Amino acid sequence: MIEIKGKYGEAKVFTDTLEPSAEGLIKTFCDQPYSAQSKIRIMPDVHAGKGCTIGTTLTVKDAVVPNVVGVDIGCGMLTVKLNEKRIDLPKLDSFIRQNIPCGRDIRERSHRSHGRLDVYELLCVKRVDIRRAKESLGTLGGGNHFIEIDKDDEGNLYLVIHTGSRNLGLRVAQYYQNVAYKACGGRAQAAIPYELAFLQGDAMQYYLHDMEFMQRFAELNRTIIKEVILDGMKLHEEESFSTVHNYIDTENMILRKGAVSAQKGERLLIPMNMRDGSLICTGLGNEDWNFSAPHGAGRLMSRKDALSSFTLNAFKKSMDGIFTTSVTADTIDECPMVYKPMEEIIKNIKETITIEK
């Protein structure tokens, strides 16, 4: 464990290795006056993000920084245990590519289930693209977002869907971070960087309202993808559970940025990488960890560094024996080698979760 102290706050980092850029971001956050009111706990998969670290958890009282929650509000994993023991993987892959838009693509028309949520509930609705929001439901994000089939030691199959709030989450996050920056004095002051500008009072409450809506939007996005795949492939759900990151748990007022809830008895999923799959875990409810766990393995290097460090051939060799059509020159930045080893993460999370499988 590493402890970092700033001018006002201090943080515990639950790992023994920390890159300098991540340490600097944590120190800068702890130098902000509002950090004094928060219990800051950083997860083992910590790595540098834009203005703050991925893997951050903190208690929230009278101030909130929208950028710390991030632009993909409510992103998470939906884990669906299937009744089937065998699946035609090439057929599934082809079906997903034909029916689930991904990356920058959206649907040509809104999915029939878009009416389960009313975008006009957003208080900042005038600042977003409503048509694009509706047509984004049932779509997969780019980068490290994925749809995969995992198999446990007993032969059970799991459909795992990792995606979030798409362009709508970005628009909402950017709007409220701009509001925060203006409220803090904008360019007329130099003490608070744009990325760490904060909201208080009514503005904070407005943000919390819209942030909660975005969590429901992201959840519906994953649900629609699940329904499209199960219906189209004639698959059957036995049970399912969700594991969310990039949000504020408003019941307990805990912010999790690239971290997940691990309350006592709570089931959660921690994905490792494209090769090693995921861990199904149960939370231990450790208060010192802010009742949290890491949301993944955490990157060892930036996407730019990954593209220059590994070849497509090395990527292909690392995925030997695993069916995928996603091993290309464009996805080298997501190869297994750019993530921290699974053993390192497992070693550091025993105090907050138990691993089921």
Task: Indicate where each model-derived feature is located.
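Acidic/polar active-site rim loop that often engages polyanionic ligands
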Residues: 73-82
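Acidic low-complexity segments
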Residues: 98-124
